[in-house]
Amino acid sequence: MDEDRFNMSVRKFLKKVGVTSQRVIEEAVRSGAVKGDVLKVRMTLTAENAPIEHVIEDDIAVR
């Protein structure tokens, strides 16, 4: 395995996930779709060809 190539691929994927997720969250908050002061979020990472299922849950203060 080429460590440098692997690390760059992972970073590129995570950057894409982070940027697009932030946009979706901001859009939901700005549109008024969030009820209450906290947005409860969950991100699930899965892979088609590997036994990966990783869940991250958190609260985001919106007001």
Q: Model-found features: residue ranges?
A:
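N-terminal acidic leader/helix
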Residues: M1-V19
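N-terminal intrinsically disordered, cationic/polar leader segments
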Residues: D2-M8, E27-R30, V34-R63
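Short, conserved loop-to-beta-strand elements that form functional interface hotspots
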Residues: S21-E27
